[in-house]
């Protein structure tokens, strides 16, 4: 184990330890399946899978005679046929059978029939937070989406309020500020006037609507109050004579007041616009928008003053013509329909999140109602109008209080909900159709919808992704990723700048640095180090509580909503040992504003300086000295580092390396404390201290050179010896890219920042041959090749070494069964598995039968269908797997056997490989110099790597220089350092270490040229830098083609390495050749070397025969163009110089020959 020296400005020990870094996956799945509760026989909570079954059952038949009730579900662990390792080997899924106990109750007789019904299989999560589906490890990425609830926002001149449910119709209100009208939209259909909508929902008179939204005041009518009343609006109807009614919402004129006085009206109710805030708990409004809507109604229905209220029929017709245009309606049905859209639990569900958001917004205590209520609608309209009047503020859509996270458990719950609603439909049909009394519970339940939905989700959903397994950090980051894309999320094309941008609420919740470059920037992000997801799906981050200016050790997790308007101090504010701030003014932030405050006004304090960034970014030392763009590249490139054969932990680390290795799941940790009984390269056996018997031992199986998803090698190496005492959770075996239990993605190299003969121009890298010789950057890559042995119409295919027309030399690498021997070195074109397929046999002559019986298969008509090593691949065969029906029970239809061959290749560092540091400083190896030619220090030590100093100033990633300086001191002092982000070692501290190591405090030294032995003119910055080899290897990119496949229609060569394609000669290349007047070169490039079919064959013949050649026919693309024109109805033919027609198709050729 490495002892690290803490070189930070803060304390070495953290206030709060980091949570388990993959708990977002583990906790979410546990909440969904509740496996712990199932194992311990505890009652299940109403969440996840349990809530799905409770929602669907009980089911009752339409006649009410039969009910199907749910009791419980359980997982059959005995049904797990394979271990995780076997699943990967055999291409199977790691899953268990799910069963539910149902009671079929006959309500007329009281009889109950009980049965455990099979509900398909359910994939189980491994303890690393992954799933194994069809032999490949997959991760379900958490989705960040718009939270259900209500949002208020503005676009152009329109003010909007939108109520978004978890499931159901969207309700949207909008105010057109030019016209002062308020409209409502249901499911983004046409607009309806809000007063009509309110009438349809039960506020059917003007009086009721006014009473709901406005404060009303009474006023006496007399000559003194005339002036005050004139121009005001009535709040209640006033009837003077039988045919003369003044309606609520009408404007009062002097003439009206005269009428009131004449007819003995002493007191009237007026709308009090100014008293909107005078009643606590009531959201009254001061706007006349609703009154304008009354006027609009009058105009729409041509109502005259003194006319009565709108009839129920005309309201429902107006509303319904928008909801279901062109449908005949009955008024009662229409009214019921409208109410069920929002008020029925079957069709509408706010979700507990939506209800929480609504209640929080409007200050209500209700947290249980899952449907909308009239109060919600009224509150929403009032709030929107108050915003319009400037009494309230708009919401920020990108605030993390309005976005929430859906992890595995919730995504699966939704899949099961959808599937179970289909199951319910089928079951109800069967209940009403069949002979009821002969029914059994299992006959009612159709399991197909469930099985197919789960299968589809894991295999094809945008959120179920092939795990990024290049190295442990890539795995870990993939599990902690938040994706805004996917079903129910955003789409790349429609996502604007605002959604992608960093928001102040991301602090401590989402990393502002780590996100992909390119079209997904800002849509795919990473969880911050301390961040957790709460029960509502909102991201929370921990803070220390500050009471009366004193910092306590109480930790409180706050969501973005709770954090609003709180005053929060930074983690590195100076605090005395008793918890008091040492400064009179402390730097704080309040809702995105940065300012200073007196200690007594502070509410909370950050837990750690690294709480605002992600795990990848927290691995970059001196992060605060880098430009953010380069830090982003650094974070992303660490995930692409290939696991090396001999990695070293970084001399300059950040303290996160150990935590990442431990939580990524690639190392092996001791489950219980004890003593090592056996430690071999295959397994470790530990006898626990609290063993219950002699046989109670902990066995750990080690992975040896297993292939990962990205073809890198997964290999464990033992860290313990026989007889060693180990503690609980101690690391007993290293995994890929870990060393001594720490993440080790690369190696420490002696670097000089110096240009060298132009070989490190433009980010190119010059390295020493020592690095290649000592295998510092050698990695192992394992490829899998598979072949299926099928049953064909003409008989089965065979795996055999008896292959027709193949020389004995080629077959020498196969064993007697036709399978390549393990340990063989194979090259492109070699046969890995000999396979023959029967050809169709015509009538066999007696002579042929005789030959067959003498010579066996060779003479028989079979086709060679062997598996060969593809181009560009070579290496050693390390394993061969044969999977038959007996092994796995089910192979795809028509397949008898699957054979897999694994080929491993040791790849040394070579020119063209991409390397990078941790600060976004990437480059391609341009030259590998002999050690004696490398520049060397005064004591004769040659450099390992030369980087161009011009790569630093414009990129502004100074972190690499500070890392190099401290690394140099560490190398010569034999120390390893922890330099936590945002509280790194100071310049003085680094200079002190350099002096101690005997270097100049600037770490500049005189370098000598390896060619001439002369010193360079100026001193050169020398240091030790941590460099990684990235997954972009030149061997995977190099590609050449002589002859290969052609596209079917255009007959031009395919493109790309995967298709063994050619190099496209595009229009610009054609222009270049035209500019040179290279007519013959151009002609052959555009015809015989591309798509002139007859010319291709002829030229090949001529080359073989050695005849000088000058062939050219008609390129196929010309024929394609001709046929397209003919398809448009042009009758076209082509003729040569002599006037003879040239045929374009075989049919044409026949016709011409006839004539």
From Swiss-Prot:
What molecular functions are annotated in GO for this chain?
A: DNA binding; DNA-directed RNA polymerase activity; ribonucleoside binding
Instruction: Report the EC code(s) recorded for this entry.
Output: 2.7.7.6
Q: Which reaction does it catalyse?
A: RNA(n) + a ribonucleoside 5'-triphosphate = RNA(n+1) + diphosphate
Q: Which GO terms describe its biological process?
A: DNA-templated transcription
Would I find Zinc among this entry's keywords? no
- What Gene Ontology cellular-component terms does the record carry? DNA-directed RNA polymerase complex
| InterPro entries the UniProt entry points to | DNA-dir_RNA_pol_bsu_ext_1_sf, DNA-dir_RNA_pol_bsu_external_1, DNA-dir_RNA_pol_su2, DNA-dir_RNAP_su2_dom, DNA-dir_RNAP_su2_hyb_sf, RNA_pol_bsu_bac, RNA_pol_bsu_CS, RNA_pol_bsu_protrusion
Q: What keywords sit in the KW lines?
A: DNA-directed RNA polymerase, Nucleotidyltransferase, Transcription, Transferase
Recorded hits in NCBIfam families, A to Z, give: PRK00405.1, rpoB
Q: Relate the assembly described in the record.
A: The RNAP catalytic core consists of 2 alpha, 1 beta, 1 beta' and 1 omega subunit. When a sigma factor is associated with the core the holoenzyme is formed, which can initiate transcription.
Q: What does this protein do?
A: DNA-dependent RNA polymerase catalyzes the transcription of DNA into RNA using the four ribonucleoside triphosphates as substrates.
Q: Which family is this sequence assigned to? A: Belongs to the RNA polymerase beta chain family.
Protein name as annotated: DNA-directed RNA polymerase subunit beta
Source organism per UniProt: Borrelia recurrentis (strain A1)
Task: Kindly list the organism's lineage.
Answer: Bacteria, Pseudomonadati, Spirochaetota, Spirochaetia, Spirochaetales
């Amino acid at each position: 184990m490495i002892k690290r020296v803490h070189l930070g400005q803060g304390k070495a020990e953290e206030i709060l330890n980091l949570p388990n870094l993959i708990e977002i996956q583990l906790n979410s799945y546990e909440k969904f399946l509740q496996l712990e509760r199932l194992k311990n026989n505890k009652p299940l909570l109403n969440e996840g899978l349990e809530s799905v079954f409770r929602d669907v059952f009980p089911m009752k038949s339409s006649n009410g005679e039969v009910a199907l009730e749910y009791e419980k579900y359980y997982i059959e662990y005995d049904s797990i046929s394979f271990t995780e390792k076997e699943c990967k080997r055999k291409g199977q899924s790691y899953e268990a059978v799910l069963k539910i106990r149902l009671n079929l109750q006959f309500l007329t007789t009281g009889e109950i029939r009980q049965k455990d019904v099979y509900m398909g299989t359910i994939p189980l999560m491994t303890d690393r937070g992954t799933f194994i589906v069809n032999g490949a490890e997959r991760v379900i990425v958490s989705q960040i989406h718009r939270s259900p609830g209500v949002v208020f926002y503005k676009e152009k001149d329109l003010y909007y309020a939108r109520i978004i449910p978890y499931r159901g119709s969207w309700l949207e209100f909008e105010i057109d500020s030019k016209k002062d009208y308020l409209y409502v939209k249901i499911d983004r259909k046409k607009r309806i006037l809000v007063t009509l909508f309110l009438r349809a929902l039960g506020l059917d008179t003007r009086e009721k609507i006014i009473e709901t939204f406005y404060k009303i005041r009474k006023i006496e009518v007399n000559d003194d109050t005339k002036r005050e009343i004139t121009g005001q609006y009535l709040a209640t109807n006033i009837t003077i004579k039988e045919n003369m009614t003044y309606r609520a919402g009408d404007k009062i004129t002097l003439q009206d007041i005269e009428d009131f006085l004449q007819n003995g009206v002493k007191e009237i109710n007026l709308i009090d616009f100014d008293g909107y805030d005078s009643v606590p708990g009531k959201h009254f409004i001061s706007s006349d928008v609703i009154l304008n809507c009354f006027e609009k109604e009058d105009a729409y229905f041509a109502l005259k003053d003194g006319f009565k209220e709108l009839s129920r029929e005309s309201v429902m017709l107006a509303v319904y013509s928008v909801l279901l245009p062109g449908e005949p309606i009955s008024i009662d049905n229409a009214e019921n329909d409208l109410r069920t859209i929002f008020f029925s639990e079957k069709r509408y569900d706010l979700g507990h999140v939506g209800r929480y958001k609504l209640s929080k917004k409007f200050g209500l205590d209700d947290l249980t109602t899952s449907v909308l209520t009239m109060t919600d609608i009224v509150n929403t309209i009032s709030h929107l109008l108050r915003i319009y009047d400037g009494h309230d503020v708009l919401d920020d859509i990108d605030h993390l209080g309005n976005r929430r996270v859906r992890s595995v458990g919730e995504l699966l719950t939704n899949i099961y909900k959808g599937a179970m609603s289909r199951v319910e439909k089928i079951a109800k049909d069967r209940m009403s159709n069949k002979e009821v009394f002969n029914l059994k519970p299992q006959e009612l339940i159709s399991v197909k919808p469930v099985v197919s939905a789960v299968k589809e989700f894991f295999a094809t959903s945008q959120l179920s992704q092939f795990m990024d397994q290049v190295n442990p950090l890539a795995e870990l980051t993939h599990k902690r990723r938040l994706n805004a894309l996917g079903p129910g999320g955003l789409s790349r094309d429609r996502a604007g700048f605002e959604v992608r941008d960093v928001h102040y609420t991301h602090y401590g919740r989402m990393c502002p640095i780590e996100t992909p470059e390119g079209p997904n920037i800002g849509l795919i992000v990473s969880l911050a180090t301390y961040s957790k997801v709460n029960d509502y799906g909102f991201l929370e981050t921990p803070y220390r509580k500050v009471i009366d200016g004193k910092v306590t050790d109480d930790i409180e997790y706050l969501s973005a909503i709770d954090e609003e308007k709180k005053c929060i101090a930074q983690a590195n504010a100076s605090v005395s040992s008793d918890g008091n701030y040492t400064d009179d003014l402390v730097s704080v932030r309040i809702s995105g504003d940065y300012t200073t405050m007196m200690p007594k006004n502070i509410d909370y304090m950050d837990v750690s300086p690294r709480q605002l960034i992600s795990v990848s970014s927290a691995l970059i030392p001196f992060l605060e000295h880098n430009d953010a763009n380069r830090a982003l590249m650094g974070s992303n490139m660490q995930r692409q580092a290939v696991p090396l054969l001999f990695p070293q932990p970084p001399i300059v680390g950040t303290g996160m390396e150990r935590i990442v290795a431990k939580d990524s799941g690639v190392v092996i940790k001791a489950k219980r404390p004890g003593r090592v009984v056996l430690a071999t390269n295959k397994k470790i056996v530990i006898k626990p201290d609290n063993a219950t018997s002699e046989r109670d031992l902990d066995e750990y199986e080690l992975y040896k050179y297993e292939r990962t998803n990205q073809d890198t090698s997964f290999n464990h190496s033992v860290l313990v010896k026989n007889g060693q005492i180990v503690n609980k959770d101690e690391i007993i075996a290293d995994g890929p890219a870990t060393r001594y239990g720490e993440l080790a993605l690369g190696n420490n190299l002696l670097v000089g920042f110096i240009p060298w003969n132009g070989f490190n121009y433009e980010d190119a890298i010059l390295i020493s041959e020592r690095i290649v010789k000592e295998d510092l950057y050698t990695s192992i890559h394992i490829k899998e090749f598979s072949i299926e042995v099928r049953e064909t119409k003409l008989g089965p295919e065979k795996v055999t070494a008896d292959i027709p027309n193949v020389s004995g030399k080629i077959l020498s690498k196969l064993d007697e069964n036709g399978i390549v021997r393990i340990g063989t070195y194979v090259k492109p074109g070699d046969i890995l598995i000999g396979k023959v397929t029967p050809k169709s046999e015509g009538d066999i002559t007696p002579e042929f039968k005789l030959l067959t019986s003498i010579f066996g298969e060779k003479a028989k008509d079979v086709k060679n269908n062997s598996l060969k090593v593809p181009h560009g691949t070579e290496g050693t065969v390390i394993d061969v797997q044969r999977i038959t029906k007996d092994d796995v029970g089910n192979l795809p239809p028509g397949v008898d056997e699957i054979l897999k061959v694994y080929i491993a290749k040791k790849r040394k560092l070579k020119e063209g490989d991409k390397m990078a540091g941790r600060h976004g400083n990437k480059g391609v190896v341009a030259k590998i110099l002999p050690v004696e030619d490398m520049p060397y220090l005064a004591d004769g030590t040659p450099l390992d790597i030369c980087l161009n100093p011009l790569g630093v100033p414009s990129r502004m990633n100074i972190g690499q220089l500070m890392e190099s300086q401290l690394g140099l001191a560490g190398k010569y002092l034999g120390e390893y350092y922890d330099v936590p982000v945002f509280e790194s070692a100071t310049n003085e501290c680094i200079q002190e270490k350099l002096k101690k190591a005997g270097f100049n405090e600037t770490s500049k030294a005189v370098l000598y040229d390896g060619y001439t032995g002369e010193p360079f003119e100026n001193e050169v910055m020398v240091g030790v830098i941590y460099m990684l080899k990235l997954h972009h290897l030149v061997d995977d990119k190099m590609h050449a083609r002589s002859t290969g496949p052609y596209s079917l229609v255009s007959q031009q060569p395919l493109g790309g390495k995967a298709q063994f394609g050619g190099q496209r000669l595009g229009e610009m290349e054609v222009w270049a050749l035209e500019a040179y007047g290279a007519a013959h070169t151009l002609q052959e490039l555009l015809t015989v070397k591309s798509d002139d079919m007859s010319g291709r064959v002829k030229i090949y013949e001529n080359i073989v025969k050695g005849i000088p050649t000058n062939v050219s026919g008609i390129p196929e693309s010309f024929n394609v163009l001709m046929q397209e024109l003919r398809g448009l109805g042009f009758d076209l033919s082509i003729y040569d110089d002599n006037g003879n027609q040239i045929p374009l198709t075989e049919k044409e050729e026949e016709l011409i020959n006839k004539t």
